[in-house]
């Protein structure tokens, strides 16, 4: 193992000890926000510290066994112990490499899911509805909660646009590779000739960020409009102007929330979405400025990048980033995304390991 990696692992162990002491401090315990933040950092380090401890113990066991090789009575046993511990070290080093992949601090957060109809008119809107239902079913299977913030329904079903908040354990980390253009090939219900049409929708996944600790927003930069919210066909029409639209004038970012009957609640939810959008834009700009914007194998998350095709006549789904084709489209559209998302995460992990090896000259 490289000396630089050993040094980093020792530093992480020191930090873990420091966090253990801090979490027992009465002042920290009384500060709920700080306590939660430090608890999460402590939890993230637990496995690394445990594996590194086992690695060092295996090295010590090899040293002890090597000192016994000169004794004929213990030579065979010592050789066997050396062999076993070398195999263990190889396995633990692989585990440590994976654990040392930089974690996205937003992975544990809730997320905003945005689905928009692209090319294809009514059929694109209908497919937006199908995608939203697919994600809703998956969220339900994970015990996550979905809260619709705004929706613009299509004339013949589905959505021109739907934006929701998905709350639960590790939502953003699980869904973040879904951003991009999703293409569908199928025969629309309105097609009398049986011809296959191609339509597209875009999906964006944004991590929810803490309103108090991120970008500062000058109230003077905001234009806040209220309007009367209404659903298709006159459903849940509000008789007061409770829907809220907030425009961040310097950037032109616009957010809306119309689902609550209370204008105050709609404004609070719209502000939370605005902060997440601005923070996401800021982070993307920083990454562009500080790196070569290397496009990972799994993709950049650019919503214009075509990432997936859903082919109904063939019953298949193809993810173009990792050349994965699954012939179980019906199950996928019912929310069975585990195999797909696991494959994307494995590919991303392999990509990150290759990057680390390159950076470490190996």
Curated annotation (Swiss-Prot):
Identify the keywords attached in UniProt to this record, alphabetized. Cytoplasm, Methylation, Protein biosynthesis
> Which HAMAP family does this entry report, sorted A to Z?
Rel_fac_1 (MF_00093)
Its gene is prfA
InterPro entries attached to this UniProt entry: PCRF, Pep_chain_release_fac_I, Pep_chain_release_fac_I_sf, Prokaryotic/Mito_RF, RF-1
Q: PANTHER family in the record, alphabetically?
A: LD18447P (PTHR43804:SF7)
| Pfam families noted in UniProt | PCRF (PF03462), RF-1 (PF00472)
The name of this protein is Peptide chain release factor 1
- What main location does UniProt list? cytoplasm
Instruction: Write down the species.
Output: Acinetobacter baylyi (strain ATCC 33305 / BD413 / ADP1)
The entry's localization annotation reads: Cytoplasm
GO cellular component assignments = cytoplasm
User: How is the protein modified post-translationally, according to the record?
Assistant: Methylated by PrmC. Methylation increases the termination efficiency of RF1.
Similarity-based family: Belongs to the prokaryotic/mitochondrial release factor family.
* Gene Ontology molecular function: translation release factor activity, codon specific
Per the record's keyword annotation, is Protein biosynthesis included, yes or no?
A: yes
* PTM annotation (N5-methylglutamine): residues: 235
